[in-house]
UniProtKB/Swiss-Prot annotation:
The lineage of its organism: Bacteria, Pseudomonadati, Pseudomonadota, Gammaproteobacteria, Vibrionales. It comes from Vibrio campbellii (strain ATCC BAA-1116). Pfam families: EPSP_synthase. Phosphoenolpyruvate binds at residues 22, 96, 124, 172, 345, 387, 412. SUPFAM superfamilies: EPT/RTPC-like (SSF55205). GO terms for cellular component: cytoplasm. Catalyzes the transfer of the enolpyruvyl moiety of phosphoenolpyruvate (PEP) to the 5-hydroxyl of shikimate-3-phosphate (S3P) to produce enolpyruvyl shikimate-3-phosphate and inorganic phosphate. This is 3-phosphoshikimate 1-carboxyvinyltransferase.
């Protein structure tokens, strides 16, 4: 297996222009495909997850032109649901942002589809979404294990009425249903069971739907009403924001060992909830400055904090490794959905933090990290999880090197991450 050893970094200084957001890129690609008219997406993320969505759209008959650097895509919208005359199999890797929304969208039109992916995708739950789709008349079958991909879908349309979705595990189930609901046969009312996790990701979904001409009535995240008679309409140009989750590593690095780092492509008006990572970093003692399209982080005397991170679960992973450089204990709470991400992130994070010497308590939905005066050089297993690799790169900000196993797993969202980090290292 390939590995990368990062030598100790003395100081972090500079500017980073963020790659496009994964969450925004795949949502916008799907809506551009369903919309009437042509959409030009700029600052599109070039990564594995986006490639899986683009490959799927090709098989579904969508025409698009992708620029040479793969960051601009002109999509010719179908102006209707997908329809195929022959059965189609879509391989979606480990891309939850492709699997869940496509599973819902393919129920709308006509044709027979199989959705599958990598072994880990077959361990990521989809039962809450399928249950809701079936309640709306969809024809969905599990091909291997109940509640998990791969799925067989026969397009029959979605019937009007009320459905319930369990919101306690992943917001992607709700996102998937919301994006398909405007093309149902009548009004759809979605009731949320349990406490909805990752609400800011639903805000992203609703915001992008509105940019494509569809309004959703949001009753305090407990009920969503999608009136019939709406159609997705291409907005013309669509700028994909920089990826706020990816910003977290650079903002944290500056807080630990700046200098300062200016991150461009996101700012105080960003639609992504993960920009709230900067607020958490500020609570820990970092010096944060906000602009319309940038965030600056400067070194601070960091201290451990106890906080609920349910609203920013992806960026919260970066807090876990930042905690190695804080004074006192850091508690990351209400992040059960780490367990159903690219890997079981609670277990993986606890295991790897212990390798570098930290004292760690892992609970059902929390992790508590106590730093130690001296970290240990360790080989970090990344579990084919891009965020594990990027989070643990921060260990190099100590006086010890860190070895990252399978560093290319960052290609899921940020293929040139380590080059960007090196460019900031003094």
């Amino acid at each position: 297996m390939e590995s990368l050893t990062l030598q100790p970094i003395n100081k972090i200084q500079g500017e980073v222009n963020l790659p496009g957001s994964k969450s925004v890129s795949n949502r916008a690609l799907l809506l551009a495909a369903l919309a009437k008219g042509t959409t030009r997406l700029t600052n599109l993320l070039d990564s594995d997850d986006i490639r899986h969505m683009l490959n799927a759209l090709t098989k579904l008959g969508v025409q698009y032109q992708l620029s040479e650097d793969k960051t601009e895509c002109v999509v010719e919208g179908l102006g209707r649901p997908f329809s195929v005359s022959e059965p189609v199999e879509l391989f979606l890797g480990n891309a939850g942002t492709a699997m869940r929304p496509l599973a819902a969208a393919l129920c709308l039109g006509e044709g027979e589809y199989v959705l599958t992916g990598e072994p880990r995708m077959k361990e990521r739950p989809i039962g809450h979404l399928v249950k809701a789709l079936k309640a709306a008349g969809a024809d969905v079958t599990y091909l291997e294990n109940e509640n998990y991909p791969p799925l067989k879908i026969v397009g029959t349309g979605l019937k009007p009425g009320s459905v319930s979705i369990d919101g306690s595990i992943s917001s992607q189930f709700l996102t998937a249903f919301l994006m398909s609901a405007p093309l149902a046969e009548g009004d759809i009312r979605i009731n949320i069971e349990g406490e909805l996790v990752s609400k800011p990701y639903i805000d992203i979904t609703l915001h992008i739907m509105k940019q494509f001409g569809v309004d959703v009535i949001n009753n305090d995240y407990q009920e969503f009403v999608i009136p019939v008679g709406q159609q997705y309409v291409a907005p013309g140009d669509f700028l994909v924001e920089g990826d706020a989750s990816s910003a977290s590593y650079f903002l944290a690095a500056a807080a630990i060992k700046g200098g300062e780092v200016k991150v461009t492509g996101i700012g105080k008006n960003s639609i992504q909830g993960d920009i709230q990572f900067a607020d958490a970093l500020e609570k820990m003692g970092a010096d944060i400055e906000w602009g319309d399209d940038y965030v600056i982080s400067r070194v601070g005397q960091l201290k451990g904090i106890d906080m609920d991170y349910n609203h920013i679960p992806d960026a919260a992973m970066t807090i876990a490794t930042t905690a190695l450089f804080a004074e006192g204990t850091t508690s990351i709470r209400n992040v059960y959905n780490w367990r159903v991400k690219e890997t079981d992130r609670l277990s993986a994070m606890a295991t790897e933090l212990r390798k570098v010497g930290a004292e760690v308590e892992e609970g059902e939905d929390y992790i508590i990290v106590k730093p130690v005066p001296q970290l240990t050089h360790a080989a970090i297993d990344t579990y084919d999880d891009h965020r594990m690799a990027m989070c643990f790169s921060l260990v190099a900000l100590s006086d010890k090197p860190v070895t990252i196993n399978d560093p290319k797993c960052t290609s899921k969202t940020f293929p040139d991450y380590f080059d960007k980090l090196k460019a900031l290292s003094c």
